[in-house]
UniProtKB/Swiss-Prot annotation:
Responsible for the transport of dicarboxylates such as succinate, fumarate, and malate from the periplasm across the membrane. InterPro entries: C4_dicarb_transport, Na-dicarboxylate_symporter, Na-dicarboxylate_symporter_CS, Na:dicarbo_symporter_sf. It is found in: Cell inner membrane. This is C4-dicarboxylate transport protein. It comes from Burkholderia ambifaria (strain MC40-6). The gene is dctA.
Amino acid sequence: MKKKPFYKVLYVQVIFAIIVGVILGHFYPALATDMKPLGDGFIKLIKMVIGPIIFCTVVTGIAGMEDMKKVGRVGGKALLYFEVVSTFALLLGLAATHILRPGVGFNIDPATLDGKAVASYAAKAHGQSTVDFLLHIIPNTMVDAFAQGEILQILLIALLFGSVLAHLGERGKVVTDFIDGLTRVLFGIVHIVTKLAPIGAFGAMAFTIGKYGVGSLVPLLKLIGTFYLTSIVFVLVVLGTIARVTGFSIIRFVSYIKEELLIVLGTSSSEAALPQLMEKLEKAGCSRSVVGLVVPTGYSFNLDGTNIYMTMAVLFIAQATNIELTWMQQLTLLAVAMLTSKGASGVTGAGFITLAATLAVVPTIPLSGMVLILGIDRFMSECRALTNIVGNGVATVVVSAWEKELDRNKLRQALAGGGEVKTTEAAGV
């Protein structure tokens, strides 16, 4: 097959669009801020099909399972994996902040901080208790779940729908075939919308730089650098070790999903690449049933980047305001963060709202301290989203391997760039 010219390759177009967006935002900020609808429009187009795609993928995956116990087994393994890896992410955030101490030297007096700017985030955080979160998973109506684009609600409906179809067997085959065909149509729509990714990335990046300016990063550059460095270490060391044990290379995996990562980088939304990620994972040898269960669930329960950010941000505020936290308080912070981070993707301004919820349970640190990082949160959200999407991709491959539903030949071929492979199963990639 003839190779595409480099300028027609999607990730090259996205990189170029991001660079142009940065230039426009820096030199013509007023014009750049007007580009925001381009980024918002692209994300809305993607979100338009996320709900139906998750529903169809999960339903066809479960309907194709002969043993319904398998659904519970896959879900249980996924949740166990999420909890263990999330704990590593939280601990790494704490450790990195202790070692690099990005907040030391600020000497901020908490009494001088104006908490009005974060009041709305704090209010939302207080309004989301554990019981509220669990009840929120149950939609008022099936239509309402799709209309609001609530991933966990759609996942619940899909689990019930798929379970019934699996129970019906041949009698439900007509419905299963219809949903399978609908899945193909929806992914076709995604392919069309994805071609607009450079425009969306340009608009989102131009707005960010135009509104906040590169100069606004300088005073808090140490925190941003610490967060990005810690996230890279997490991906290469923690996820890299998990990947190596499972039998593939994290570097090759990241390279395989580079188009999805660039879309996330440009839009600062991990949801913008969810449909493409699911399709890529299936092509890489993960079974549809595992992809359908693990990826959507991971978007609420496996937010590795958000976990690193939360413990790091809390400790940064403590350091900046010269507040010493005891080890017991830090263990409390860790335990609270493990709970507040779950379901964060279902809330607007997720990272900041979860941070407010965590701080509310550690009264030693003033909630008004969030003002210190409010201005740079937008610049850190890209790294959160990138780490989250890599983490969910790795989780899906790992759970597929645990279930012995990972086609290693397909995985090896995909990560090698689509070259020919032997039919014998590879020991590693």
